[in-house]
Amino acid sequence: VAQAVILAFSALLIIPSALQARVQGGNKKPSLSLKATPAVSFAPARVVVVAEVRGGADDNEEFYCPTVEWEWGDFTTSTAEADCEPYEAGKSQIRRRYTVEHQFKNPGSFRIRLMLKKGTKVISSANALVQVRPGLGPPGGDQQ
């Protein structure tokens, strides 16, 4: 009887990886972080922005196949929609990383905002600040 109890207890300690992910916070809502590089530059500035979805289950239905909307802070926006297969619990995988490049032609402070949306509902958003300083002018141009 003691051996049966020990074996049953040992079997409980061996948790399949998918179940283990859920036990370790996989049911928590993922969070979104945003980083712009470089954070400070000269106009015209080419900035690379990386967004990461952290935490939560890899098959989180709410974060599966969202519309991705970027507000650049310079009165322009970008939107992307993926053509995804229908969601299947335990099979569908959320995208964990979004990378995009944007050019700021004029100097200023810009608040970049990324929104992940399902229809019109924002499911998560994140912000990053970029500072673009006046450029030195055209190469070989007169500096007055």
Language model: regions and residue ranges:
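Bacterial N-terminal signal peptides
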Residues: 4-16
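Extracellular/lumenal mature domains of secreted and surface-exposed proteins
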Residues: 17-144
